[in-house]
């Protein structure tokens, strides 16, 4: 069908539609059956075809004039759904011959699509079944609602070529009445929806005005009936709206009356909750009384039957511990549920489980008697003396070594500590007279006497270590004395440490009448004595006065080389007294003539005195030994201390000059030679 062939459709196309409110921007789409059409939503051509099918089914036997409304409705729908971009051809024309009623276009809404086979089976093969995606109703925006409200408030009759606006009812614009009954409200909503569908399905309900102002009405009989029903339904709503206008006081009274029953209900609900809690609390109290009223005596084996499987709330536990089902350190109730199953299965273990139950209760103790620090017994009131367990062995001091195998225990009457009978002390024989002397043991108690009289294996190792350390120190001293590198200063210091009383640690070297030297008995080492009769080497043992330790002699190659070197140097500087920088400087006394045996007394210094009378050479090196750090050599002047060559006293020079038989001229030569060297080197005279 072509709308341009019909004069009525041409006039409708010439009419300009009223200005529509701006719609939100939507993307335009095209239809597969009508690719040239651009629209938003669904295709208007397809909609016109559907409406034409409906008109043909409803008005199949009517005249040709009755078929005009579908063509007009198709033109109106195309004008509505096409994008308004071509205003020159079919756009807005306010000065046309006729105008379409403005209240018509906002009222158009989509309806549910259905197949043509429902109405007429003859058209089932012509039209395809429609998709249900196009059945969604278009939502009315807020702008459309405002425009509908403005149109509804306009005057109903306008003359002079104006548009006659008839008020129409819309479910969106009209207020919805609140009904207390939900069933009635649902039924009313369904009826209103059916009325809306019937109202908006009829698309031929519109009015057109001519130039002369005559109204051209094109409507069917069914449309008139629908309007009458709607108008009849509107009248009672207006009456209800007038009746609802009441003062505020009435609303307050009504609200108070409605709230009173709710308060009553809340009170009864709170009372019921409180009664339930009170009932639970009473039940818990009864369970506690039953549990605490049981017999908790140690000898009782009766179990509380009322105790449930789950653990009950204890007085010393919190609610968190109840949910954790774990035992706390502050539990006071015994546990019966764990061992209850064993009573029925194993009768032989019945007594053992009873003991476990009683031991699990901290208020009753079945511990065995044990010794405490003060000697009392713990738990001895629970059993008679005959039923008590034997006490544990006594707590002895820490013994690192194994104790002796034989012990004589004496059982005490109070059953507390075993006591060892003290063994008689062994007799000690005095070595001086061979008579056994009584042993005096320190300490007044038996334990200290046992400690001192017992063997060293029973003593603590701390004292053994201390005594062994003393022995090791003494052995080290002996080893140091045996070494050939020991000096006289170290020997004298050891002698002073040992406690020997000597006059300023001095020793005398005396000359006999025959020219030989007599040495004290404490001098250690080799002695080479050269006499006029024979050249013999006398070797004898030195000994310590206090310690009583005998040291063997030790002659080393190193000593011999050192002594030979010193002898060689003394021959060059004969008769000189050699001193180190650290040595003391006492006066040297030479009494008597050369044969009279001069006497020299020395202090804490190393003295090497040589007599050159009668060709006899005597080397005294009893304690003339030096360490590696202090020994010196004529070849190595940097190693060791410097040597000062000093002369004898004047008296000794004079005596040596007038020397007797043993002196000779050798002594004067040595003294004069030493004096000349001292004068030339030291510049002292």
Curated annotation (Swiss-Prot):
Residue ranges the record marks as coiled coil: 549-578
Main location per UniProt? membrane
Q: Where is the composition biased (Basic and acidic residues)?
A: 292-314
Upon changing residue 318 to K, the result is: Slightly increased activity. Normal plasma membrane localization. Complements the ops and brx mutants. Strongly increased activity
- Membrane topology field: Peripheral membrane protein
Q: Describe the disruption phenotype.
A: Short roots associated with both reduced cell division in the root meristem and altered root cell elongation. Early emergence of lateral roots at the root-hypocotyl junction. Reductions in the complexity of vascular networks in cotyledons and discontinuous phloem differentiation. Impaired primary root protophloem differentiation during root development leading to altered phloem long-distance transport. The double mutant vcc ops exhibits a complete loss of high-complexity vascular networks.
Q: Where is this region: Disordered?
A: 1-34, 152-202, 280-314, 419-471, 584-640
For this protein, the record's Pfam families field holds:
DUF740
Question: Which domain of life does this protein belong to?
Answer: Eukaryota
Q: Where in the cell is it found?
A: Cell membrane; Cytoplasm
Cellular component, GO, one term: apical plasma membrane
Swiss-Prot/TrEMBL keywords = Cell membrane, Coiled coil, Cytoplasm, Developmental protein, Differentiation, Membrane, Phosphoprotein
The PTM entry states: Phosphorylation at Ser-318 amplifies the promotion of protophloem differentiation.
The record's section on InterPro entries has: OCTOPUS-like (IPR008004)
Tissue specificity: Expressed in provascular cells and phloem initials (e.g. protophloem, metaphloem, sieve element precursor cells and sieve element procambium precursor cells).
Q: Basic residues composition bias: which ranges?
A: 280-291
The observed outcome of changing residue 318 to A is:
Reduced activity. Normal plasma membrane localization. Complements the ops mutant
Q: Name one GO biological process term.
A: root system development
Q: How does it assemble?
A: Interacts with VCC.
Q: Which family does it belong to?
A: Belongs to the OCTOPUS family.
User: What does this chain do?
Assistant: Potentiates primary root protophloem differentiation. Required, together with VCC, for embryo provasculature development and cotyledon vascular complexity and connectivity. Regulates roots architecture. Mediates the recruitment of ASK7/BIN2 to the plasma membrane.
Protein name per its UniProtKB record: Protein OCTOPUS
The species this protein was found in: Arabidopsis thaliana
**Which gene name does the record give?**
OPS
């Amino acid at each position: 069908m072509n709308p341009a062939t019909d004069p009525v459709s041409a006039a409708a196309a010439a009419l300009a539609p009223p200005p529509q409110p701006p719609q939100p921007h939507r993307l335009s789409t095209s239809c597969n059956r009508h690719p040239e059409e651009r629209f938003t939503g669904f295709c208007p051509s397809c909609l016109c075809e559907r409406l034409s099918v409906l008109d043909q089914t409803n008005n199949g036997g009517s005249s040709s004039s009755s078929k005009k409304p579908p063509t007009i409705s198709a033109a109106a729908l195309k004008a509505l759904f096409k994008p308004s971009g071509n205003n020159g051809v079919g756009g807005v024309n306010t000065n046309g011959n006729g105008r379409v009623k403005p209240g018509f276009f906002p009222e158009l809404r989509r309806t549910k699509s259905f197949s043509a086979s429902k109405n007429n089976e003859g058209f089932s093969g012509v039209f395809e079944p429609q998709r249900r995606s196009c059945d969604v109703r278009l939502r009315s925006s807020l702008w459309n609602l405002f425009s509908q409200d403005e149109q509804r408030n306009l005057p109903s009759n306008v003359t002079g070529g104006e548009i006659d606006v008839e008020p129409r009812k819309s479910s969106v614009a009209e207020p919805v009445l609140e009904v207390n009954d939900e069933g009635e409200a649902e039924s009313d909503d369904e009826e209103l929806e059916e009325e809306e569908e019937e109202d908006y399905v009829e698309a031929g309900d519109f009015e057109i005005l001519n130039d002369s102002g005559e109204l051209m009405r094109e409507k069917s009989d069914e449309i008139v009936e629908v309007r009458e029903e709607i108008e009849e339904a509107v009248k009672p709503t207006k009456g209800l709206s007038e009746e609802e206008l009441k003062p505020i006081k009435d609303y307050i009274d009504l609200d108070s009356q409605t709230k009173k029953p709710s308060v009553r209900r809340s009170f009864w609900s709170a009372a019921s909750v409180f009664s339930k809690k009170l009932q639970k609390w009473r039940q818990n109290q009864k369970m506690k009384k039953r549990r605490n009223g049981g017999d908790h005596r140690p000898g009782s084996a009766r179990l509380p039957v009322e105790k449930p499987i789950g653990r009950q709330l204890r007085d010393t536990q919190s609610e968190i511990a109840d949910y954790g089902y774990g035992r706390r350190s502050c539990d006071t109730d015994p546990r019966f549920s764990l061992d209850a199953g064993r009573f029925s299965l194993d009768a032989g273990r019945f007594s053992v489980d009873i003991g476990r139950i009683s031991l699990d209760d901290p208020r009753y103790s079945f511990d065995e008697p044990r010794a405490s620090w003060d000697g009392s017994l713990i738990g001895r009131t629970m059993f008679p003396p005959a039923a008590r367990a034997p006490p544990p062995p006594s707590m002895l001091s820490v013994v690192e070594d194994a104790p002796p195998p034989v012990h004589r225990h004496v059982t005490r009457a109070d059953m507390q500590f075993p006591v060892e009978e003290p063994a008689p002390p062994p007799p000690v024989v005095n070595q001086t007279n061979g008579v056994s002397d009584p042993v005096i043991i320190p300490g007044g108690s038996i334990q200290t006497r046992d400690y001192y009289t017992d063997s060293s294996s029973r003593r603590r190792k701390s004292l053994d270590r201390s005594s062994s350390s003393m022995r090791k120190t003494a052995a080290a001293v002996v080893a140091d004395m045996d070494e050939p590198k020991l000096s006289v200063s170290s020997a004298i210091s050891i002698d002073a440490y040992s406690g020997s009383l000597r006059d300023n640690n001095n020793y005398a070297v005396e000359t006999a009448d025959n020219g030989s030297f007599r040495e004290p008995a404490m001098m250690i080492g080799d002695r080479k004595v050269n006499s006029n009769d024979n050249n013999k080497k006398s070797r004898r043992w030195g000994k310590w006065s206090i310690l009583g330790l005998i040291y063997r002699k030790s002659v080393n190659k190193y000593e011999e080389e050192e002594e030979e070197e010193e002898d060689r140097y003394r021959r060059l500087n004969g008769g000189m007294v050699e001193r180190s920088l650290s040595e003391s400087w006492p006066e040297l006394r030479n009494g008597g003539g050369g044969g009279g045996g001069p006497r020299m007394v020395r202090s804490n210094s190393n003295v090497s005195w040589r007599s050159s009378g009668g060709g006899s050479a005597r080397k005294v090196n009893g304690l003339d030994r030096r360490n590696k750090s202090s020994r010196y050599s004529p070849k190595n002047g940097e190693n060791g201390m410097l040597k000062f060559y000093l002369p004898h006293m004047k008296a000794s020079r004079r005596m040596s000059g007038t020397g007797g038989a043993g002196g000779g001229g050798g002594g004067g030569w040595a003294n004069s030679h030493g004096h000349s060297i001292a004068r030339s080197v030291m510049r002292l005279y």
